[in-house]
Amino acid sequence: MGRFLLVTLSLLVVAFSLNGANNCCCPQDWLPKNGYCYKVFKDHKSWDDAEMFCRKLKPGCHLASLHSNADAFDFSEYITDYLTGHDHVWIGLRDTEKNYIWEWTDRSRTDFLPWKKDQPDHHNNDEFCVEIVSFTGYLQWNDDSCTALRPFLCQCKH
């Protein structure tokens, strides 16, 4: 009987830990997803200042990287619920070399690029950082001047 109880209890612990693994370590006002915690910050910062702010939160934090339509829809809903204005939002994608090769600050694969029509364009040779565009429901991206002041989306590893 004791062995049965121990096995049952162990299985329950494993089941609960797996069920809550996505939510286990994120602060209350952060969005848990795929082993990361995400938060949109309303403060308006340049892209570089936003990335530095995210990095200072704790090791493993950066401006967010998005890798699928599912990510885009989840973040669209989250940002729409959180932001009251119509501000575009910085994410962690940048063309550092100014050659249309876009890279994530977390060094993850650049495998999903839902650009707004006619973007990216490096307008006036000044747009090398990426924002999620508010009037597309936060579903499409635009390149903009890295000095523009925007709210931003951070991601941190659990």
Swiss-Prot record:
Q: According to its UniProt record, in which tissues is this protein expressed?
A: Expressed by the venom gland.
Q: Which GO terms describe its cellular component?
A: extracellular region
Under InterPro entries, the record lists: C-type_lectin-like, C-type_lectin-like/link_sf, C-type_lectin/snaclec_domain, C-type_lectin_CS, CTDL_fold
Asked if the Swiss-Prot or TrEMBL record annotates the protein with the keyword Glycoprotein, the reply is no
Give the range the annotation lists for the signal sequence.
1-20
Q: Is Disulfide bond tagged as a keyword? A: yes
Motif Galactose-binding, which positions? 119-121
- Report the transmembrane regions from the record: none
The UniProt keywords, alphabetically, are:
Calcium, Disulfide bond, Hemagglutinin, Lectin, Metal-binding, Secreted, Signal
Name the cystine pairs: 26-37, 54-154, 129-146
Q: Which residues form the C-type lectin domain?
A: 33-155
Where found, per UniProt? Answer: Secreted
Binding sites annotated in the UniProt record for Ca(2+): 119, 121, 127, 142-143
**Which SMART domains does the UniProt entry name for this protein?**
CLECT
Molecular function terms, GO-annotated:
carbohydrate binding; metal ion binding
In the record, the note on similarity to other proteins reads:
Belongs to the true venom lectin family.
PANTHER family given in the database record: MANNOSE, PHOSPHOLIPASE, LECTIN RECEPTOR RELATED
Q: How does it assemble?
A: Homodimer; disulfide-linked.
Function, in words = Galactose-binding lectin that binds to and agglutinates erythrocytes in a calcium-dependent manner.
| Protein's recorded name | C-type lectin galactose-binding isoform
Q: Which organism is it from?
A: Hoplocephalus stephensii (Stephens's banded snake)
